[in-house]
Amino acid sequence: MHSSSVHVPLIEFLKNRIYLGAYDHHKRDTEDLAYFTVEDALPYNAFYMDFGPLNIGHLYRFAVLLHKKLNEDSTQGKGLVIYSSTSPKERANLACLLCCYMILLQNWAPHQVLQPIAQITPPLQAFRDAGYSSADYEITIQDVVYAMWRAKERGMIDLAKFDLDEYEQYERVDQGDFNVISKDFIAFASPQQSKRGGLNEPFQKVLEYFVENNVQLVVRLNSHLYDAKEFTKRNIKHIDMIFDDGTCPTLEYVQKFIGAAECIINKGGKIAVHCKAGLGRTGCLIGAHLIYTHGFTANECIAYMRMIRPGMVVGPQQHWLYLHHDDFRSWRHTMIVDNRPDPLIGNLFPLCSYEDYKQRLKEAKRKERLQLQQQLTSPLADSSVINTPIRRRKVSGALASKIQTVVPIESPGQPRKYFEDSEDIDEVEMVNNSDDENTMQDIIQSSPARYDSVTPKTKDNSDWRVLRSISTNNVSSQQSIHIIKTTTTKTVNETLSSPPGTSPTNVLRVSKARSKNRIASGNSQTSRAHSGGVRKLSGKKH
């Protein structure tokens, strides 16, 4: 192969097929080599002292020209030397284009494309920012290569689907001056209105594109140069997150921005961000989200954005992105979109610490449980909500007097009873079992209208029996009483006094022999008091 007339080595990428060279004069083809340059066809449009890297539109055009040259008959069987001038800047731009081509179209790994250009002499110049100050931060071809590789792996770039016409149209100032950075973000320069309601052509292009491409949020970072209603009346949400030109946002601002962006992305929409030129402040916030989402390093992020929109991230903003790129990547695992809206970002939701979020949820659940317990245990809840209130009936005096002579006021429940009989005791106790273990007393009163079927049919005051409740009734105060005591285990019938008229206590006494006749061993007999109620007496002799 022919040696170069200058001291720049010929770099082999594909043996006998693709080489990288540098010459200060036009080279003619030889029998072994064909020469090809794109330096004049793909110029870089500088802002100030910046010179590259060439953007993705240049990369697409380079790939088209290279494929065309490789397929020409004149290059068949020859090595193709792609060359530039010997300027370090031009050499760097061409080397960067060729490396990105090998990454995106030939699917080479980063180390494969970096190995041929490693430690070459003279070295390739690093890229600087578009600012007017001295360049104190640089990115290298290695940063660009890894940026393109990561973007390809994350599905952010596909040259086979790239629309060159659209890209080159809208990057022009008179056509809107915006670029689609990723499927989620658009970076653009601030639209301007000379008067309210008037739309110039660039602003009209921006509005039309945003409506057609589902842009749901516009974030303004600079002072007002247009009426935000131009977006909102087209159903595009608009928020202001203004900070000074050339400065960097606070981390709190970045958290709010990323949270707001996540809210829109989760709904399938896009976010458009602008400052005055759509480069510095815009690059800070979009870059922070790219690092948060895709794991770029700061240098990779800057390189990627400049490949899409040249000049992004200026001056100290480069250092800021480098200092905080670890924070942005860690937020992916330590922060979450909050559930409390933030008025600063149009009531969208910012990022918040995952631990704080969990603690707040626990505290909210604890307060909710405590409030529920207080409602359940409050007297008002017990009486008016849970339990139905008991309504007590009022009974007149005349009716109460009649009830007393007919049935007991309180029921003994469901008794289980038996007799205890003793030869040495003249009276027999009847103990009635009750479920609530309260002693109930029923007064058995003799009645002149009914006779016992067991005892002789002679009118005797001791034979008259009815049921009445304990009360102070003047009419029956001179009559005999019989008391039945009720407990949970037995029923005992006890005669408390002698027949009526013989004792001031007026308690009926029943003889032992008579008790045995009324309750026979092995038989169950019923004694009815027809005037008031029924008392069933049963039991065995012990």
From Swiss-Prot:
PROSITE patterns: TYR_PHOSPHATASE_1, TYR_PHOSPHATASE_2, TYR_PHOSPHATASE_DUAL
Domain Tyrosine-protein phosphatase: 177-334
Induction: Both during budding and hyphal growth, no detectable levels are observed in G1 cells but, as cells passe through S-phase, begins to accumulate with a peak being reached during mitosis.
Effect of loss of the gene: Leads to defective cell separation and impairs hyphal growth.
Enzyme Commission designation: 3.1.3.48
Active site: 275
Disordered, as annotated region: 516-542
GO biological process: autophagy of mitochondrion; cellular response to glucose starvation; cellular response to osmotic stress; DNA damage response; hyphal growth; invasive filamentous growth; invasive growth in response to glucose limitation; meiotic nuclear division
Primary enzyme class: hydrolase
Biased composition (Polar residues): 518-529
UniProt signal peptide: none
Cytoplasm is among the record's keywords: yes
One Pfam entry name: DSPn
Gene Ontology cellular-component annotations: cell septum; cellular bud neck; cytoplasm; kinetochore; mitotic actomyosin contractile ring, intermediate layer; mitotic spindle; mitotic spindle midzone; new mitotic spindle pole body
Annotated catalysed reactions: O-phospho-L-tyrosyl-[protein] + H2O = L-tyrosyl-[protein] + phosphate
Entry's localization field: Nucleus, Nucleolus; Cytoplasm; Bud neck; Cytoplasm, Cytoskeleton, Spindle pole
The family this protein is said to belong to: Belongs to the protein-tyrosine phosphatase family. Non-receptor class CDC14 subfamily.
Entry protein name: Tyrosine-protein phosphatase CDC14
Protein species of origin: Candida albicans (strain SC5314 / ATCC MYA-2876)
